Amino acid sequence: MPPKFKRHLNDDDVTGSVKSERRNLLEDDSDEEEDFFLRGPSGPRFGPRNDKIKHVQNQVDEVIDVMQENITKVIERGERLDELQDKSESLSDNATAFSNRSKQLRRQMWWRGCKIKAIMALVAVILLLVIIILIVVKYRT
């Protein structure tokens, strides 16, 4: 609901005002004309007009309720968007970490493959040397 105007003011509301203004604002006495403008007309001749005013006031109240619901929905949507943004940042960070780790693992596997190939080549060279030495020793004797 929209804020209503205060009929009685606190001292904090009127700080800095001239004393006569403060005294007039804080008086409890009000005349009939003031009451007429604050409360509206009353009596039988204002009946249909009063119904229209009530109808318009009801429509205004409905619009206010709808606007409050819309504001609540916008706030909730903003919160969900913030959560979604946090999750997407986290996902992006995880994707970057995964990419870096996969590159590191690829390098490790490449070196492991190189080591295995080097060991197999060394074993093949040793076998060839053993065979050659055996052949040389057999023909010398």
UniProtKB/Swiss-Prot annotation:
Its main location: Golgi. The keyword Phosphoprotein applies. The modification Phosphoserine is found at S17, S30. Residues 1-51 are annotated as: Disordered. Residues 52-112 form the v-SNARE coiled-coil homology domain. It is a single-pass type IV membrane protein. This is Vesicle-associated membrane protein 4. The gene is VAMP4.
